[in-house]
């Protein structure tokens, strides 16, 4: 089994999309606990649970698209969409989280590393298969 087979964009899109979709469902179901986990128990206001639930709901649509792309697209189109998903995830989620949450005591460093790493692997899988093999 070579690297190209392991880095199949279909599996990466469906796998990452499904995992993050599941995590988003938990965020919608228990926004209060998500807020406590992210902001700290002594730093959670009444409205923070709703913010976390809406953030998770918003992310559900993004990660559902990852799954749909992985299932429906093929060949070169799948590789291109995988690279585009990787780039947009890196820019908006990783850079956005670093810039927007840096001063607010929101500890997102581990989340940034996980999302950044997964996004980078997603981009590599698309690049390795860019010829549509």
Language-model-detected regions and their locations in the chain:
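Hydrophobic alpha-helical transmembrane segments of polytopic
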Residues: 9-19, 55-58, 84-88, 111, ...
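Juxtamembrane helix-break-helix junctions at the cytosolic face
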Residues: 9, 65-87
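Cytosolic juxtamembrane helix and N-cap/initiation of the first transmembrane helix
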Residues: 1-23, 46-47, 132
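Hydrophobic transmembrane helix segments
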Residues: 18-58
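Short juxtamembrane and helix-loop transition motifs at transmembrane-helix boundaries
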Residues: 40-50, 70-80, 98-102
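Membrane-helix boundary connector in multi-pass membrane proteins
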Residues: 92-112, 128-131
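Membrane-water interface at the C-terminal end of transmembrane alpha helices
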Residues: 118-133
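Aromatic-anchored segments of alpha-helical transmembrane domains
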Residues: 20-25, 87-98
């Amino acid at each position: 089994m070579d690297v190209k087979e392991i880095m199949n964009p279909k599996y990466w899109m469906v796998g990452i999309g499904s995992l993050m979709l599941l995590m988003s469902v938990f965020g919608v179901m228990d926004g209060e606990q998500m807020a406590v986990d992210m902001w700290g128990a002594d730093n959670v206001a009444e409205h923070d649970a709703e913010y976390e639930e809406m953030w998770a709901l918003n992310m559900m649509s993004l990660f559902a698209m990852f799954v749909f792309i992985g299932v429906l697209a093929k060949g070169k189109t799948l590789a291109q969409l995988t690279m585009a998903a990787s780039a947009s995830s890196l820019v908006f989620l990783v850079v956005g989280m670093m810039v927007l949450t840096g001063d607010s005591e929101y500890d997102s460093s581990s989340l940034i590393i996980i999302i950044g790493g997964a996004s980078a692997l997603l981009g590599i899988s698309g690049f390795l298969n860019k010829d549509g093999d």
